[in-house]
C-alpha cells in the first residue's frame, strides 16, 4: 500500500492554537500506512460533553457499536481514531481489539468508562 493517501490535502495545515481541556497525540502505528501518522489519541478534560454521528449501516464494525453504547452517557475522557474503516465484518475479534484499545487508552483516567 502506498504511503500517501489520495485524500491528503495539497497544502500544509497551519499550526493551531491550543484548545483548553484538550490534548492531542498522533503516531505512525502502522495501522494502515507505513511512515505516516495513522493513530490519534485525544484526551478531554473531566466532564467534557460529547455527541456523535455514526454510520447508518446495518453492518457496523465493533468501533461503531462501542460508540453507540457509550454516546448516550454524553461524556468523554478520550477518543481514539485510526485510519482504518469501522464498517467492516470483524466479529468477535474486532470487539476484543476495541475493548483492548479502550483499556490501553484508559490510562488517561483508569476509572473512566467514557473512552470512544
Q: Where would I find each of the regions flagged by the language model?
A:
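Molybdopterin (Moco) oxidoreductase catalytic core of the xanthine/aldehyde oxidoreductase family
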Residues: 1-7, 108, 112-116
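N-terminal amphipathic/basic leader segments beginning at the initiator methionine
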Residues: 1-55
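Catalytic-core regions of core metabolic enzymes
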Residues: 18-19, 29-30, 53-56, 64-70, ...
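Short glycine/serine/threonine-biased micro-segments
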Residues: 19, 33, 76, 82, ...
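Short coil/turn connectors at secondary-structure junctions
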Residues: 35-38, 59-61, 73-78, 110-114
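Conserved active-site and cofactor/substrate-binding residues in soluble primary-metabolism enzymes
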Residues: 36, 55-59, 76, 92-100
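Active-site-flanking structural segment that lines cofactor/substrate pockets
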Residues: 42-76
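Alpha-helical support elements that line or immediately flank enzyme active sites
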Residues: 80-110
